[in-house]
Amino acid sequence: MKMMKGQVVLNMPAEKAWEMYRNNEIISKINPELLSRADYIQGDGAPGSLRLFKLGPGVSNYVKESMEKIEKVVSGRSVTYEVIGGDLKEMYDPYRVTFSFVPTQGNSNKCIAEWKAEFEPSAPATPPPEQARDAALRFLESFDNFQLSY
């Protein structure tokens, strides 16, 4: 299985970033250009739940929506999804993403937000999901600006 990852430093505690990521109402307002809506369509965010992400106009030429099944949750730290429907599922099978929020050492008011994907291209010519990584990191960077407004 291939892997790709990236990370950004956020100027907020990991717990706050975690709460923002897990709350559909908040996450849908952080950066509508990249993510216009998130809904748990089955479950409440625990393993086995299904979450639908509707992507915004900034990435809709690449991915319009993604249906994800939550596989693992480490409360306050990370969530791992397997993409089970949408555009990414057609390009990669499997496609598994982990978002994690880890406090920085020596400063509890900052955290490292990491995006990691494990994937197999569905066709030999399918490129790595660099656009997905770049969009995810831009979205995570938006957390800092959003937290100032709510």
Language-model-detected regions and their locations in the chain:
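Structural signal for hydrophobic/aromatic residues that build the beta-strand cores
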Residues: 17, 51, 70, 81, ...
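Hydrophobic/aromatic beta-strand elements that line small-molecule binding cavities or substrate pockets
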Residues: 6-8, 65-72, 95-105
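Short, highly charged C-terminal tails/helix-capping segments
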Residues: 34-35, 141-150
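Glycine-rich portal/gate segments that line the openings of hydrophobic small-molecule binding cavities
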Residues: 25-29, 38-90
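A short, structured loop/turn motif at beta-sheet edges
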Residues: 14, 43-45, 71-78, 100-112, ...
